[in-house]
């Protein structure tokens, strides 16, 4: 009898699998012609965003979904172009649970000219961006950010994710509530902050501490690599760790295991590094 019950249960399960509807996928795309320096704003409630660049005078946007349809009863796409300014807003449906409780996914792929102002905001997704020059702002509520080759005024923020940026050039500000930060590039200005993660930063030749740099972790290790000719006033302090400086420094104030103040080369703008509960290491690039 037990074998019959098991057999019936197995047949019912197989029938359910066979008759289950396939996961739905949908997509939408549009190309926008631009002339000169463009402004692009992309916002999505719950999706991943990827930005790449090319030598072109157009912006191409491609939205793909799984377990969502695109349209009035599913994912809505609001888009507007006013000259060289383009706004894209991708909204998830109010009820967004799919088959057997599985939620759908949204992905936004954007191909842009190499020079433009970029503003990306996603509530709960990862963002990747590759060589773009302009005013750049990337914000995610609960995802990771990966950026490469961004130039200009750059702001990267994650509420609870990792930030990795390489080959940056210009003024960079990054912060995350609870993630690790890895950055390298040539900086005119550098601000990096994490509530509960480590910071690993490398400044390339040509970097300048003009308007001041600040690196802070509430509860993590900080490593900063600087070129040998960087001019700065150093102020490094940790509440519960050690500070090590492996570059030439002229001590002008405090020098002990947890705090260092002094000049790098001829001095200059203020380079402030602080950690509430982690070690600080300053090394040569």
Model-predicted segments: where are they?
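Intrinsically disordered, low-complexity terminal regions
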Residues: 1-285
């Amino acid at each position: 009898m037990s074998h019959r019950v098991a057999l019936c249960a197995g047949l019912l399960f197989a029938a359910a699998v066979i008759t289950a509807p396939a996961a739905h996928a949908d997509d939408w795309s549009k190309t926008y012609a631009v002339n000169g320096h463009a402004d692009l704003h992309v916002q999505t409630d719950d999706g991943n965003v990827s930005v790449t660049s090319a030598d072109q005078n157009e912006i191409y946007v491609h939205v793909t979904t799984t377990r969502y349809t695109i349209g009035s009863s599913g994912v809505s796409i609001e888009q507007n172009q006013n000259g060289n300014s383009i706004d894209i807003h991708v909204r998830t449906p109010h009820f967004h649970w799919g088959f057997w409780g599985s939620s759908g996914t949204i992905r936004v792929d954007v191909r842009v000219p190499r020079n433009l102002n970029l503003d990306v905001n996603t509530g709960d997704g990862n963002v990747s961006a590759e060589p773009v020059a302009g005013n750049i702002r990337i914000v995610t509520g609960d995802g990771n950010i990966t950026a490469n080759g961004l130039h200009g005024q750059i702001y990267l923020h994650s509420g609870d994710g990792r930030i990795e940026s390489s080959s940056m050039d210009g003024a960079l500000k990054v912060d995350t509530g609870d993630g690790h930060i890895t950055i390298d590039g040539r900086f005119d200005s550098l601000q990096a902050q994490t509530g509960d993660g480590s910071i690993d930063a490398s400044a390339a030749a040509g970097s300048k501490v003009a308007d001041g740099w600040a690196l802070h972790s509430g509860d993590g290790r900080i490593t900063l690599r600087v070129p040998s000719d960087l001019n700065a006033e150093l102020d490094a302090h940790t509440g519960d760790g050690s500070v090590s400086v492996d570059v030439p420094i002229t001590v002008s104030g405090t020098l002990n295991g947890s705090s260092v103040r002094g000049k790098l080369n001829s001095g200059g703008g203020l380079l402030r590094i602080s950690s509430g509960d982690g070690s600080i290491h300053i090394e040569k690039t």
